[in-house]
């Protein structure tokens, strides 16, 4: 820590507040350098945190955290917060098994007020916390930091609308790092922001409204004057003013002294306050500034070279999906690809470039994405919604009400199904089979490799009804890709004929199941479809085997194994059943390999669980 003389002194925000203001620029420089060094050695989210260094320092310098409640939306930008709140020396463990959580996490620190991972939750939770503080007359401040992407979600505006109407003391800070809302940043804006956030202006404004409320012509003049003054700062402020907030900004989010002055002024204001700051994602590290998307989440890399390591030669499942999408779009101009702000992650970059008229990024709006797709389907188009398993949870009503009830041909390409690895509890794709399986009209497919994935996507595209294909994060296994052909709905595939024990596999754990089957001389069936289920195959297996093992990378409760159990009960089959899958708890972070081993879903673990079960029967 010799390279970081000031940062090494900061073990809590109390230490930070002992520094004089003139030391803060140096601290910010050290914090940014330390963040870059630590993340490059451990992997993690980089560009967002580089952009919030000054904001983080200013917030902890001005407010009495943890007494004052600081909430971070999503949490990608909270690494500097972790460093300043006693976790500096553990940053090398972030996102690793047993290490620091990748996002703010209540169980990890008293400074983490809200556990997060999904976007747009901070203002709703913050309002609840602020109202509780108001009821208890604690004098506690509530501050919510939200990005310009997250604030576009409907939930954020629902919360803003509510907060403005109840007029509770709280501060919402918009971290605008993509120039997507306003470009009005400069000395004049910073000066006016200090003026408008000051107590003199606030008092004059409120007093003037009361004094002149009975004089319509003068009242209107005061209102117009206020609007014109604010118009110098940012036209977008009108929107937040209409929602009931006192809007300040935009100001330079990398000017630590301007931030502190403005925050101190706003600290004394009552009612809902809104501060708009402009930052640069990847600030201070040229490669990240140039490519903030590429450096958003990074593996281990040499930050001195500034180059990220090249990925495996085997394509990812996301890339397999993206190439399939391009292949079909070239043949069918009515195919429409939809993503809720996950173009890169879902493998849709090439598609968006080759077929811009058939591509829609609807921003962080999962509910809208699904109902938008329903509308396209009604109009005769063939929408494909590319969405992570964990984010499909946010559009469950739309999946039922707007797609399934109307039996509309919408295809859901569900990425990151099963164990996702380092992002932990909030991002595991553990529940989609369970929450989809009970929905009428929906076809659900679980590919075991990339060729099966392509065939199932094509089957879903052609079947003329709601369909879902769920596939995991990471690289495919390298099988040969065959020409596209529709699969018969609800029909499984025999992989290996054995005796006594049958493993019914759902998804990409098939290779592990096959290894186990060799040792046990077990039958292996790739079930392919969770719905409709191949009940005929299950009946045949039950009549010729003494033990059926179901295998899936989904919660056991309500999952594919439960579907098999229900079928066996309905058929009144007398056969033992062992359901293997994800247990009834939230799965923490770790690599996919580590977590599958811990959950005993690798070959060794599956073998062990079967052997233990056999001893009981």
UniProtKB/Swiss-Prot annotation:
Listed GO CC annotations: cytosol
InterPro entries: Dxylulose-5-P_synthase (IPR005477), THDP-binding (IPR029061), Transketo_C/PFOR_II (IPR009014), Transketolase-like_Pyr-bd (IPR005475), Transketolase_BS (IPR020826), Transketolase_C (IPR033248), Transketolase_CS (IPR049557)
Name of the molecule in the record: 1-deoxy-D-xylulose-5-phosphate synthase
Gene name of this polypeptide: dxs
Function: Catalyzes the acyloin condensation reaction between C atoms 2 and 3 of pyruvate and glyceraldehyde 3-phosphate to yield 1-deoxy-D-xylulose-5-phosphate (DXP).
Stored HAMAP family: DXP_synth (MF_00315)
Family in the record: Belongs to the transketolase family. DXPS subfamily.
UniProt entry tagged with the keyword Protein transport: no
Record pathway: Metabolic intermediate biosynthesis; 1-deoxy-D-xylulose 5-phosphate biosynthesis; 1-deoxy-D-xylulose 5-phosphate from D-glyceraldehyde 3-phosphate and pyruvate: step 1/1
Record GO terms (molecular function): 1-deoxy-D-xylulose-5-phosphate synthase activity; magnesium ion binding; thiamine pyrophosphate binding
Organism: Histophilus somni (strain 2336)
């Amino acid at each position: 820590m010799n390279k970081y003389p000031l940062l090494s002194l900061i073990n809590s925000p109390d230490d930070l507040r002992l520094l004089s203001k003139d030391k803060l620029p140096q601290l910010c420089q050290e914090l940014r350098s330390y963040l870059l060094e630590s993340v490059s050695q451990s992997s993690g989210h980089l560009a967002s945190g580089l952009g919030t260094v000054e904001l983080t320092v200013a917030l902890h310098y001005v407010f009495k955290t943890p007494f004052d409640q600081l909430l971070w939306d999503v949490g990608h930008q909270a690494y500097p917060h972790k460093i300043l709140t006693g976790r500096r020396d553990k940053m090398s463990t972030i996102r690793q098994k047993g290490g620091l959580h990748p996002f703010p996490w209540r169980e990890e620190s008293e400074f983490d007020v809200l556990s997060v991972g999904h976007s747009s939750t901070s203002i709703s939770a913050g309002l609840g916390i602020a109202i509780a503080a108001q009821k208890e007359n604690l004098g506690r401040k509530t501050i919510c930091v939200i990005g310009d992407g997250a604030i576009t979600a409907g939930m954020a505006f629902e919360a803003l609308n509510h907060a403005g109407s109840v007029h509770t003391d709280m501060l919402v800070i918009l971290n605008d790092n993509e120039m997507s809302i306003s470009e009005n940043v400069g000395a004049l804006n910073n000066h006016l922001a200090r003026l408008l956030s000051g107590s003199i202006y606030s008092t004059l404004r409120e007093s003037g409204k009361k004094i002149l409320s009975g004089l319509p012509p003068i009242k209107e003049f005061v209102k117009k004057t206020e609007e014109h003054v604010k118009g110098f700062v940012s036209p977008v402020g009108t929107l937040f003013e209409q929602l009931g907030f006192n809007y300040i900004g935009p100001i330079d989010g990398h000017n630590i002294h301007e931030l502190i002055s403005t925050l101190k002024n706003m600290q004394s204001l009552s009612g809902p306050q809104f501060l708009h700051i402009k930052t640069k994602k990847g600030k201070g590290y040229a490669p990240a500034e140039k490519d903030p998307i590429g450096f958003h989440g990074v593996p281990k890399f040499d930050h001195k070279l500034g180059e990220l390591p090249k990925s495996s030669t085997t394509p990812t499942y996301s890339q397999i999906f993206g190439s399939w999408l391009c292949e079909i779009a070239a043949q069918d101009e009515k195919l429409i690809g939809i993503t809720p702000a996950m173009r890169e992650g879902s493998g849709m970059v090439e598609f968006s470039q080759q077929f811009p008229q058939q591509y829609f990024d609807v921003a962080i709006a999962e509910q809208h994405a699904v109902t938008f797709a329903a509308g396209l389907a009604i109009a005769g188009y063939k929408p494909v919604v590319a969405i992570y398993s964990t984010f499909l949870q946010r559009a469950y009503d739309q999946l039922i009400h707007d797609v399934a009830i109307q039996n509309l041909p919408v295809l859901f390409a569900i990425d990151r199904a099963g164990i996702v690895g380092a992002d932990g509890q909030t991002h595991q794709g553990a529940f989609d089979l369970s929450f989809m399986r009970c929905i009428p009209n929906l076809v659900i497919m679980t590919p075991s490799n990339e060729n099966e994935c392509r065939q199932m996507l094509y089957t879903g595209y052609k079947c003329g009804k709601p369909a879902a294909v769920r596939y995991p994060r990471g690289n495919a296994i390298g099988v040969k890709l065959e020409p596209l052909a529709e699969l018969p709905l609800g029909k499984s595939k025999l992989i290996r004929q054995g005796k006594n024990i049958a493993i019914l596999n759902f998804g990409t754990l098939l290779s592990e199941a096959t290894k186990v089957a060799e040792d046990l001389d077990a039958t292996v069936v790739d079930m392919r479809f969770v719905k409709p289920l191949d009940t005929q195959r299950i009946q045949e297996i039950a009549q010729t085997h003494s033990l059926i093992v179901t295998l899936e990378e989904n919660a056991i409760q309500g999952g594919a194994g439960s579907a098999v159990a229900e079928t066996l009960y309905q058929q009144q089959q007398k056969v033992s059943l062992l359901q293997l899958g994800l247990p009834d708890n939230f799965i923490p972070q770790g690599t996919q390999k580590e977590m599958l081993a811990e959950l005993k879903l690798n070959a060794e673990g599956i073998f062990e669980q079967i052997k233990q079960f056999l001893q009981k029967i």
